[in-house]
């Protein structure tokens, strides 16, 4: 099992969000960045658009479009900062909420004007410190709009946007049907804005330093930095920050370098894709497109050559199958079947037609759930079947290349 | 073209819609409706699609205009 070790900031490729003292204190934050300028919603929207800021929670959707969809509703919205981070291989949102929470809370204020309810949705473990910080900010007159803390349960799908909106409305944190978008009408009928905490932290930086400054990092098409959680076969796993387009090898070097020869790297997390362990590969949508991948929420897992990629994927698929919110038939039935079929292949219980069956099941579940959990799971498995093609062939003859590599 | 939308959180998977609309839907391994194509409804099948929507016991099946869904 790959787990994320405590994720101290400090190693970097290009530090911005995590460039300060990272003590989480209000006084150090104000000393470093000063007060947030007062901006109207239109100005915030314009800056987000000029900066090209996209969501850091996985889908990479432009922030300004969501802001404008919610504003078009003409009713006071519910605004949610999403710090759930249900993904086990991700530690960046927790790191951000621990080391630079004031940037997140600044960003939340920028999108909270006129809202009927403003929420920070985060795991319970961080609430005490966040509560104290929110009180201090109110006392210092920083937060025009009061912020409510709501507990994000420890479940993979709890951070999906409609699940977050449901939890905030006092219901179970499970996803809802998408016929009506929550930016139009969320659980209580109000337009609902859900943004990843890192997206909001970038917005707080843009409000201070400008769209041009933001664009000085990353690529022209994918501007800015992102937080990456690097784990697996690296010397010192943790959270690093880099501009989009950073070389995969530089991210791994920033996490202490590979601790063993690598065979592949999982990029984008449990809903992401396997890519070759090529140091020069740019970590950006454009760079990862040929592999059907994307940076997603910045999860990078390095796979050592003596571990079997099919086994590792089967393990993740088993985990994901256990995380289905028991609602949608194709997902509830399909993901466990998909995981067990892949496990048969991984554990050398080969039957003819097994790879084709994995492929069929992955296609069958895609697009057939209230949320994109089945789609993401299918994407991961499709990418594994491509990236570990040689392993699949070996497994069908009863051999495992990773076991062979161990000698 | 209008499209079929299934609310998967409501669908009970007994496959009534696939019986009523075999041109567009098949039952998957577990009885849930799976699209033969991409869920868009050609005009000629619109009446049958409406009937399937009306008869869905779970109110899970909808016809949506192209812009949404
Ligand atoms: C199964 C699933 C789990 C998700 N979990 C999270 C999460 O833990 N945190 C998060 O910010 N976004 C998560 N997302 C993405 C959210 O639905 C949503 O796109 C995001 O919070 C929007 O914020 P952003 O545009 O700032 O990225 C998840 C999506 C899916 C399908
Ligand atoms: S698609 Fe799966 S994970 Fe998503 S809501 Fe439906 S059952 Fe839950
Ligand atoms: S008729 Fe309705 S409940 Fe039955 S399978 Fe079709 S969509 Fe699901």
Role assignments for model-derived ranges:
Chain A
Residues 29, 80-93, 184, 229-234:
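Gly-rich Lys/Arg/Thr-decorated short loops/hinges at beta-loop-alpha junctions or inter-strand turns
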Residues 105-111, 243-259:
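Short amphipathic, charge-patterned alpha-helical segments
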Residues 77-80, 84, 97, 101-112:
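Glycine- and Gly-Pro-enriched alpha-helical subdomains that act as flexible
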Residues 1-45:
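Cofactor-/ligand-binding subdomain signature composed of acidic, glycine-rich
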């Amino acid at each position: 099992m790959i787990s994320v070790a405590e994720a101290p900031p400090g190693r970097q490729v290009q530090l911005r969000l995590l460039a300060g003292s990272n003590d989480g204190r209000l006084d150090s934050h104000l000393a470093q960045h000063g007060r947030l300028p007062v901006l109207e919603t239109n100005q915030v929207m314009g800056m987000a658009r000029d900066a090209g800021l996209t969501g850091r929670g996985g889908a990479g959707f432009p922030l300004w479009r969501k802001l404008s969809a919610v504003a078009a509703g003409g009713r006071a919205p519910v605004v949610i900062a999403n710090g759930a981070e249900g993904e086990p291989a991700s530690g960046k949102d927790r790191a951000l909420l621990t080391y630079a929470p004031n940037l997140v809370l600044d960003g939340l204020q920028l999108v909270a004007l006129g809202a009927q309810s403003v929420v920070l949705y985060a795991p319970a473990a961080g609430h005490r410190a966040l509560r104290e910080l929110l009180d201090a900010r109110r006392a210092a007159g920083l937060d025009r709009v009061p912020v409510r803390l709501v507990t994000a349960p420890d479940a993979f799908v709890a951070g999906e946007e409609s699940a977050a909106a449901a939890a905030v409305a006092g219901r179970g944190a499970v996803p809802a049907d998408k016929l009506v978008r929550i930016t139009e009408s969320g659980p209580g009928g109000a337009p609902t804005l859900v943004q990843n905490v890192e997206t909001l932290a970038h917005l707080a930086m843009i409000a201070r330093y400008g769209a041009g400054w933001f664009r000085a990092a990353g690529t022209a098409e994918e501007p800015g930095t992102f937080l990456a959680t690097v784990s697996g076969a690296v010397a010192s796993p943790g959270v690093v920050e880099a501009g989009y387009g950073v070389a995969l090898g530089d991210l791994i070097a920033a996490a202490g370098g590979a601790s063993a020869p690598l065979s592949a790297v999982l990029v984008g997390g449990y809903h992401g894709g396997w890519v070759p362990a090529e140091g020069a590969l740019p970590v950006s949508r454009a760079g990862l497109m040929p592999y059907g991948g994307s940076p997603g929420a910045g999860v990078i897992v390095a796979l050592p050559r003596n571990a079997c990629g099919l086994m590792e994927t089967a393990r993740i698929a088993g985990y994901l199958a256990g995380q289905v919110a028991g609602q949608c038939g194709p997902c509830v039935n399909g993901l466990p079947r998909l995981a067990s079929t892949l496990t048969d292949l991984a554990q050398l219980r080969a039957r003819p037609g097994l790879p084709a069956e994995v492929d069929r099941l992955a296609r069958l579940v895609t697009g057939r759930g209230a949320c994109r959990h089945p789609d993401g799971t299918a994407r991961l498995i499709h990418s594994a079947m491509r990236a570990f093609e040689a392993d699949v062939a070996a497994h069908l003859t009863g051999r495992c290349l990773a076991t062979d590599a161990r000698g | 073209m209008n499209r079929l939308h299934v609310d998967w959180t409501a669908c009970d998977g007994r496959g009534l819609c696939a019986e009523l609309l075999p041109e567009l839907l098949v039952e998957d391994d577990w009885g849930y409706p799976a699209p033969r194509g991409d869920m868009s409804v050609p005009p000629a099948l619109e009446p049958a699609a409406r009937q399937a929507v009306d008869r869905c016991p779970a109110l899970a099946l909808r016809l949506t205009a192209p812009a949404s869904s």
